[in-house]
């Protein structure tokens, strides 16, 4: 009988932090050390908790533990999420693609197409239904596609590595206090938890928007931009305004000045105009 061939590209993935990155807060370093001590893929929580549909809350039938390849993926993606975790906002400040790349879970075919399926399925089919993380994705009305998911870590995620909700909350308070001390030193107003979450979310959305330079999306964006710029400038700007308004809640919009909002509209307008006028696309090297 023939031995079954491995159906994953990297049977021993390893998380490699980005080079030249900033020093991590003490709590993050502590959490990373905890993750080294515990086999998160075989945690008791994985057997006690039930998979639930994130949208409906209904139980998803499950008949076996994680297979070894998915378990290996979980063992590396957990420390990657911790490394990129923003303590005050609960956000993982990295996309699924970035996590997959840093963990050796992405592959590139001979034709040059990248696949992050191994990481994305672990997240959507296990970690989110188990309640370890929450994911949000927004429809990009300008480009006609979804933005990369925004990932948030829940207290249950930290229970995986033996960190209690109380210890997590204490770390949040300490980190916000440190952040506000720095702001006061610069003559700025201190932030509440909700303010800090808003600031972090803005940074995350801006980071996601930077991913627009990804070659795999450029052709689709270019087609849309060409179609859009057949309209009058007034109509184009109106569509951009509707898109930007949809990104924020009413309370968040109230905190953005008219001048800043106009600036965002102009940035979006000129970005799309340049894309529409670009004569050709240069493939990745």
Swiss-Prot record:
GO biological process: DNA replication; plasmid maintenance
Pfam families linked: IncFII_repA
InterPro entries xref list: Plasmid_replication_init_RepA
Signal peptide coordinates: none
Keyword Ribonucleoprotein carried by entry: no
Assigned keywords, A-Z: DNA replication, Plasmid, Plasmid copy control
UniProt superkingdom: Bacteria
Described purpose of this protein according to its UniProt entry: This protein is essential for plasmid replication; it is involved in copy control functions.
Stated family: Belongs to the IncFII RepA family.
Name the record gives this protein: Probable replication-associated protein repA1
Organism the protein comes from: Buchnera aphidicola subsp. Baizongia pistaciae (strain Bp)
